[in-house]
């Protein structure tokens, strides 16, 4: 499989341009980030990475310098056969979200000009849309609007100043969302959800502050913190397209800190990209803040989302497969990390379909310059975020504990994935718990740093963790968003901990992820060492029927499972132990080489 190489991220005029939501438009761009810069022949036909909120600040680049972090020459990437394009259903989904009109039907046009509910293509009439949100009504009396500083599909953002109250004379940013564009119940619900998210998440150091929300007959006004330092993308361009490692680490710690926070609240952003991070000021050490939760959503601990949203260059493979969770945000951060360190996009295509094929099939290039000069730990960090298997991808909390970022002394947050792993462990069979205990004794010291931090964040009592420890830890971090996503419901499935405690050794067995360990280069040594422990402490005679029950498979799997049991003593072989740890299905097992 070859590599996809990046291209210019500059504005282009006469080609397909994906919007901030990943949609391709054939119309010329109306907002050029650097209109004075001539179009390069190399950049012709390159989709623009378009911002939802266009930066109001002038580029620091001199005229004639290509405004792009993409320095790698473009190369054509040919496939042996054209795969089905995922672009069409994505475009359709985005059109529905924005309330675009459906395909024409042989029906009379309603004479009434009032908005009606879009029934998604069903024939017949509809109900009038209720666009009354119940927000405050006196925006004009409290704020004086200034110039426009950004514009997107769903609205525009203006500078404003408070006229009265505690915030008198304070400058703010006001996102103005036109009610005329709310042409479906989905688009109305998107606005309600965005406001609810901003309210719940405001207050974290790296989240844009939410102040208030108002409405009138025509618009919704969301009053937020004004970040005057411009976009992260502009800073990347100002530095010639890439960041030195030491500076990239400082940026990524801030991005991961915010992401770990809203993931713990049960929120998935779904559109993380350099344009959606703003600096509070022009200072080099300015604080970075995440913005634009217009595509974000609440997600339950046992839920997978299936609607395809986001920006093409940053979309995760599982999003294209329509089954994803918070891991999709981590892929986007992996793309941002790649750009920060080398100045190129890891996946490129002339069209959205080509970009998506590249995301699904190609591997990022870590061979060309400047990668040979970048530290091995930095490359490992990026690779573990750009793993196409979402189960092997680091969480935000795990990424903060990665050796590459450890010198930055990032404050670690509780990782909700620990709750899901512990829940599975305490509900597992004794045989599986023995296998995981053996694996925990082979965990590398570098990985133990994360587990030790999580153990202490759960505030153990008398050296152990009870159900109350898990409950109180969630309570300490809870916001209204966590209640909306119903994450505390997982505590109802952890009742066995009401009668016992987990010491640190057993916590490691419960909270270790087999897939995370498999992503490490030393996985073979880890598995071998773990099997040696299992041979001494947990391996026993097991029948094919019992093993099938442990794996939750039927009699059709017996021939396969028989190969996992040693004929000499009836115990699990090394192959059987590794497969048993995975809990893989028969289909996935038989498709892998032995």
UniProtKB/Swiss-Prot annotation:
Biased composition annotated in UniProt, kind: Basic and acidic residues: 116-131
CDD domains: STKc_CAMK
Comp. bias (Polar residues): 37-58
Residues holding ATP: 149-157, 175
Transmembrane segments: none
Residue numbers binding Ca(2+) 2: 501, 506
Residues in coiled coil: none
Swiss-Prot/TrEMBL domain comment: There are 3 contiguous domains conserved in the CDPK subfamily: a kinase domain, an autoinhibitory (junction) domain and a calmodulin-like domain. The autoinhibitory domain (409-439) inactivates kinase activity under calcium-free conditions.
Name the record gives this protein: CDPK-related kinase 4
Organism this protein belongs to: Arabidopsis thaliana
Source organism phylogeny: Eukaryota, Viridiplantae, Streptophyta, Embryophyta, Tracheophyta
């Amino acid at each position: 499989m070859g590599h996809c190489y990046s291209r210019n991220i500059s504005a282009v005029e006469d080609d397909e341009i994906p919007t901030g939501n990943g949609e391709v438009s054939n119309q010329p761009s109306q907002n050029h980030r650097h209109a004075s810069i001539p179009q390069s022949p190399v950049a012709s036909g390159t989709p623009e990475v378009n911002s939802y909120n266009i930066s109001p600040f002038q580029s620091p680049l001199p005229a004639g310098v290509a405004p792009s972090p993409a320095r790698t020459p473009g190369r054509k990437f040919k496939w042996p056969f054209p795969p089905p394009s995922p672009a069409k259903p994505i475009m359709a989904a985005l059109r529905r979200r924005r309330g675009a009109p459906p395909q024409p039907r042989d029906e009379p046009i309603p004479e009434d000009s009032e908005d009606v509910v879009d029934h998604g293509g069903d024939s017949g009439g509809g109900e009038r849309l209720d666009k009354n949100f119940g927000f405050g009504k006196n925006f004009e009396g409290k704020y004086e609007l200034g110039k426009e500083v950004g514009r997107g599909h769903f609205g525009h953002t203006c500078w404003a100043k408070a006229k009265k109250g505690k915030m008198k004379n304070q400058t703010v940013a006001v996102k103005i969302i036109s009610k005329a564009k709310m042409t479906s119940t989905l688009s109305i619900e998107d606005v309600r959800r965005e406001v609810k998210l901003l309210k719940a998440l405001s207050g974290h150091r790296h989240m844009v502050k939410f102040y208030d929300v108002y409405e009138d007959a025509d618009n919704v006004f969301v009053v937020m913190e004004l970040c005057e330092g411009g976009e992260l993308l502009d800073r990347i361009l100002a530095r010639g397209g890439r960041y030195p490692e030491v500076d990239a680490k400082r940026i990524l710690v801030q991005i991961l800190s915010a992401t770990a926070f809203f993931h713990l609240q049960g929120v998935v952003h779904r559109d993380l990209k350099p344009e959606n991070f703003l600096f509070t000021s022009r200072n080099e050490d300015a604080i970075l803040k995440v913005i634009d939760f217009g595509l974000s959503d609440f997600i339950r601990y046992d839920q997978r989302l299936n609607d395809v949203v986001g920006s093409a260059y940053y979309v995760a493979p599982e999003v294209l497969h329509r089954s994803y969770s918070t891991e999709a945000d981590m892929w986007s951060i992996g793309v941002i990390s790649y750009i920060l360190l080398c100045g190129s996009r890891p996946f490129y295509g002339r069209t959205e379909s080509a970009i998506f094929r590249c995301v699904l099939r190609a591997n990022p290039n870590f061979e060309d310059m400047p990668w040979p000069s970048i530290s091995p730990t930095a490359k490992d960090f990026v690779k573990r975020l750009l793993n196409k298997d979402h189960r092997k991808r680091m969480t935000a909390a795990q990424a903060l504990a990665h050796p590459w970022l450890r010198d930055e002394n990032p404050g670690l947050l509780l990782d909700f994935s620990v709750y899901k792993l512990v829940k599975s462990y305490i509900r597992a069979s004794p045989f599986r718990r023995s296998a995981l205990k053996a694996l925990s004794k082979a965990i590398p010291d570098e990985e133990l740093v994360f587990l030790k931090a999580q153990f202490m964040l759960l505030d153990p009592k008398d050296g152990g963790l009870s159900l109350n420890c898990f409950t109180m830890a969630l309570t300490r971090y809870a916001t209204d968003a966590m209640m909306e996503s119903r994450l505390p419901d997982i505590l109802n499935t952890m009742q066995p901990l009401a009668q016992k405690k987990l010491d640190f050794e057993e916590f490691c067995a419960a909270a270790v992820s087999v897939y995370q360990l498999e992503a490490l280069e030393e996985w073979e040594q880890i598995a071998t060492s773990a099997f040696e422990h299992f041979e001494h402490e947990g391996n026993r005679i097991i029948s094919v029927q019992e093993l099938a029950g442990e794996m939750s498979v039927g009699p059709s799997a017996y021939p396969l499972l028989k190969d996992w049991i040693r004929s000499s003593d009836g115990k699990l072989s090394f192959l059987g132990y590794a497969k048993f740890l995975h809990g893989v299905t028969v289909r996935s097992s038989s498709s892998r080489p032995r």
